[in-house]
């Protein structure tokens, strides 16, 4: 049961929040604001000795916070036997804001708490009154609970902590215009400079006697093949910080390493797209390989269709392979007269089978090409003795 607190006048209160809105209730576009409630902390320790011999109605002490010319004051009162006949079995600790008559009264928001301790600095548990009628803050404890804890030294230590909301400040921030930046482009330029100026290089690639200097970390980060080569300390390349390439042209490897650094090609790849695709496949540079494959697909012609079909098959470039087959089927008489067709006949007969399979698929779907799409119609294919009859669809 809560003890009753008799009489008195409530003093103090909570200050305004200081929130501000635009006249239409919506912040202006591009403008932001910030509200800060400044809080100052007040701490005070009050020691009372021979507490059991306190016979007056209450003990009083004061806590101060100086702010410029203004001094904020709080009264701390200890009621050894309550403040009335109805609660004489309780000890009260009360806190009140004291209004100075010489200072303009204003609402100051604050939060407070009491901590009661013994002479041995052990906490004494108190209860907080939920709705005091005569004070801003009240804690209480029964006398028969308190006194056994403070004996035999008969001393209490009262710690009061007050958090005071002294000021509310709202600031408005005008938008600041920054020049747009292109961090991706800047990154490319930085890595291009790192490569072209050979800054802090720790690795060399010897291509037929010509040196390309690079950085192990960059190569390992971009290529799984380089990663495996350079992170295993027992490889020759990791030990010597040098690798040798004798089966590819210097220009192709230089372009490949440039792409590793910059994510784009340094120059026109017309004369090296096929070789660059092969290099990208070897070092598992999927982006570069896809870039080369796209270029070759867009530049397929009668003279290179067969060789690109072989490249697409050997180096797992499915889009290039498919485009080459489609191109050959659309121009069989022209394509089969090229040296590339001879290469297919001699070294890659499996591709002939794939071409006929494509004819069969076109027949079953009703698609048309320059090659007869009717099953059982003989076709004269250069390099193959006799007439080749594609199998009927559905078998």
From Swiss-Prot:
Q: Main location per UniProt?
A: cytoplasm
Q: What PROSITE patterns does the database record attribute to this sequence?
A: BTB, MATH
Q: What is the effect of changing residue 94 to Y?
A: Severe loss of interaction with ppfr-1 and mei-1
Q: In which pathway does it act?
A: Protein modification; protein ubiquitination
Q: Enumerate the spans annotated as BTB domain.
A: 201-269
State one molecular function term (GO): ubiquitin protein ligase binding
Q: Where in the cell is it found?
A: Cytoplasm, Myofibril, Sarcomere, M line; Cytoplasm, Myofibril, Sarcomere, I band
Report, as the record phrases it, the tissue specificity of this protein.
Answer: Expressed in body wall muscles.
Q: Which Pfam families match?
A: BTB, MATH_2
SMART domains documented for this protein: BTB, MATH
User: Where is each MATH domain found?
Assistant: 41-162
Q: How does gene deletion manifest? A: RNAi-mediated knockdown at L1 larval stage results in the disorganization of myosin thick filaments in adult body wall muscles characterized by the formation of abnormal myosin heavy chain myo-3 aggregates and V-shaped crossing of A-bands. RNAi-mediated knockdown of mel-26 also results in increased lifespan.
One GO cellular component term: cytoplasm
Quaternary context: Interacts (via BTB domain) with cul-3. Seems to be a component of a E3 ubiquitin-protein ligase complex containing cul-3. Interacts (probably via MATH domain) with mei-1, which targets mei-1 for ubiquitin-mediated proteolysis. Interacts (probably via MATH domain) with ppfr-1, the regulatory subunit of the PP4 complex; targets ppfr-1 for ubiquitin-mediated proteolysis. May interact (via MATH domain) with unc-89 (via Ig-like C2-type domain 2/3 and, Ig-like C2-type domain 50 and fibronectin type-III domain 2).
Q: Please name the PANTHER family in this protein's record.
A: SPECKLE-TYPE POZ PROTEIN
Functionally, this protein is described as follows: Probable substrate-specific adapter of an E3 ubiquitin-protein ligase complex which mediates the ubiquitination and subsequent proteasomal degradation of target proteins. Controls degradation of microtubule severing protein mei-1 after meiosis. Controls degradation of ppfr-1, the regulatory subunit of PP4 complex, after meiosis. In body wall muscles, involved in the organization of myosin thick filaments, likely by regulating the degradation of mei-1 downstream of unc-89. May also activate the TORC1 pathway.
This protein is called Protein maternal effect lethal 26
């Amino acid at each position: 049961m809560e003890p009753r607190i008799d009489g008195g006048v409530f003093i103090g209160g909570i200050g305004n929040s200081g929130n501000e809105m635009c006249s239409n209730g919506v912040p202006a576009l591009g403008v932001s604001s910030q509200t800060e409630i400044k809080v100052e902390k007040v701490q005070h320790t009050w020691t009372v000795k021979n507490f059991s011999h306190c016979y007056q109605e209450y003990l009083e002490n004061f806590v101060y916070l100086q702010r410029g010319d203004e001094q904020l004051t709080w009264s701390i009162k200890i009621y050894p036997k309550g403040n009335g006949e109805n609660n004489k079995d309780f000890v009260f600790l009360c806190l009140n804001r004291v209004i100075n008559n010489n200072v303009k009264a204003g609402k100051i928001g604050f939060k407070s708490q009491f901590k009661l301790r013994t002479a041995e600095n052990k906490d004494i548990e108190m209860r907080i009154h939920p709705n005091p009628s005569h004070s801003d803050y009240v804690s209480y404890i029964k006398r028969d609970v308190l006194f056994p804890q403070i004996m035999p030294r008969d001393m209490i230590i009262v710690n009061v902590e007050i958090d005071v909301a002294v000021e509310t400040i709202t600031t408005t921030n005008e938008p600041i215009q920054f020049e747009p930046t292109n961090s991706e482009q800047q990154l490319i330029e930085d890595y291009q400079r790192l490569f072209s100026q050979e800054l802090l290089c720790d690795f060399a690639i010897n291509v037929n006697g010509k040196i390309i200097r690079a950085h192990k970390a960059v190569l390992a980060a971009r290529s799984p093949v380089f990663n495996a080569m350079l992170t295993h300390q027992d490889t020759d390349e990791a030990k010597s910080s040098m690798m040798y390439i004798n089966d590819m042209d210097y220009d192709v490897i230089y372009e490949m390493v440039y792409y590793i650094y910059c994510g784009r090609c340094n120059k026109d790849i017309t004369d090296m797209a096929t070789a660059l695709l092969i290099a990208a496949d070897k070092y598992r540079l999927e982006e570069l390989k896809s870039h080369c494959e796209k270029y070759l697909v867009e530049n397929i012609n009668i003279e290179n269709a067969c060789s690109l079909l072989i490249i697409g098959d050997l180096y797992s470039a499915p889009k290039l392979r498919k485009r080459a087959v489609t191109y050959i089927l659309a121009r069989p008489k022209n394509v089969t007269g090229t040296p590339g067709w001879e290469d297919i006949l001699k070294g890659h007969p499996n591709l002939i089978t794939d071409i006929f399979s494509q004819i069969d698929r076109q027949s079953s779907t009703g698609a048309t090409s320059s090659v007869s799409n009717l099953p059982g119609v003989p076709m004269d294919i250069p390099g193959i003795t006799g007439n080749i009859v594609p199998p009927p669809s559905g078998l």
